């Protein structure tokens, strides 16, 4: 557990303050001339990003999320690491790995022009993870993984970003995913690239394969386009639980599937990253809206 007083050196007057909104969970509240934001040390988890020129937040956060120690937060940008979804060989281990439920250390906070930048870190053998997030007119997130051992390892990761939308019926995804083949995780069937926008009429769980450096989430209901620019990523996961699955999720409201979709930047399955001793791999994304 991190005590609030231990975070005092990282405060930035009128820009970054710390609170304990839930027992045992500390968060940082960010205010800049261009946005507001929030992050939790548990999970190295960004939970809010709201540009001030937008009526609605960019990130979705479930009203039913369980804010408790060692519990994942439903929404924002969870970090899936070092495996994605179920563990490949041990079903007793938690889905999406350990990074999203462990306590991270705040390493630094600073002002860059009008932006607030924070860095969080966690070490669990053999990996050291560093997350740098910059809040401003855009949200920039970079996750670096370093192998601190003397052996070769591999890992999966995903920045499991939940986007808030007006209504799932009003949105489509366009851009580089048009040219990417995908695995439908619901049917285990692989599909060739379809060269058309992605829309939602049912539960959707797809892993798109290949570099997708420019993705657009177009929301006709809010007349808004969210741009996602990714680097160091060979996988993009598109997900919405729809009606039946959300009923099995205790931390997800009955109608919340209508107000969100996930577009996840990462490296999973066949794109798992081999990493030699001492090497560092960085996956990053930039989110901005227009």
Where are these regions (language model features)?
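Hot-dog-fold acyl-thioester-processing enzymes
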Residues: 58-99, 227-250
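Active-site/ligand-binding surface loops and adjacent short beta/alpha elements
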Residues: 152-154, 162-236
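Beta-strand-rich N-terminal accessory domains
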Residues: 1-71, 213-214, 218-234, 277-290
């Amino acid at each position: 557990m991190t005590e609030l007083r231990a975070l005092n050196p990282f405060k930035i007057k009128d820009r970054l303050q710390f609170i304990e909104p839930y027992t045992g969970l500390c968060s940082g509240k960010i205010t800049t001339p261009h946005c507001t934001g929030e992050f939790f040390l548990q999970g190295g988890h960004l939970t809010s990003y709201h540009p001030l020129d937008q009526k609605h937040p960019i990130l979705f956060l479930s009203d039913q999320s369980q804010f408790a120690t060692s519990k994942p937060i439903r929404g924002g940008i969870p970090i899936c690491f070092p495996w994605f979804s179920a563990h490949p060989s041990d079903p007793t281990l938690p889905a999406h790995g350990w990074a999203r439920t462990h306590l991270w250390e705040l390493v630094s906070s600073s002002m860059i022009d009008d932006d607030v930048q924070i860095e969080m870190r966690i070490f669990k053998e053999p990996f050291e993870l560093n997350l740098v997030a910059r809040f401003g007119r855009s949200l920039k997130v970079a996750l670096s993984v370093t192998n601190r051992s003397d052996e070769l390892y591999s890992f999966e990761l995903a920045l499991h970003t939940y986007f808030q939308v007006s209504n799932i019926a009003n949105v489509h995804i366009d851009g580089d995913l048009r040219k990417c083949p995908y695995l439908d995780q619901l049917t285990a069937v692989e599909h060739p690239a379809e060269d058309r926008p992605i829309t939602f009429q049912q539960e959707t769980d797809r892993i798109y394969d290949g570099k997708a450096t420019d993705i657009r989430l177009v929301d006709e209901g809010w007349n808004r386009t969210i741009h996602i620019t990714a680097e160091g990523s060979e996988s993009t996961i598109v997900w919405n639980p729809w009606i039946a699955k959300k009923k099995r999720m205790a931390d997800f409201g009955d109608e919340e599937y209508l107000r969100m979709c996930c577009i996840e930047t990462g490296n999973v399955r066949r794109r798992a990253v081999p990493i030699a001793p001492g090497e560092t791999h960085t996956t990053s994304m930039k989110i901005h809206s227009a």
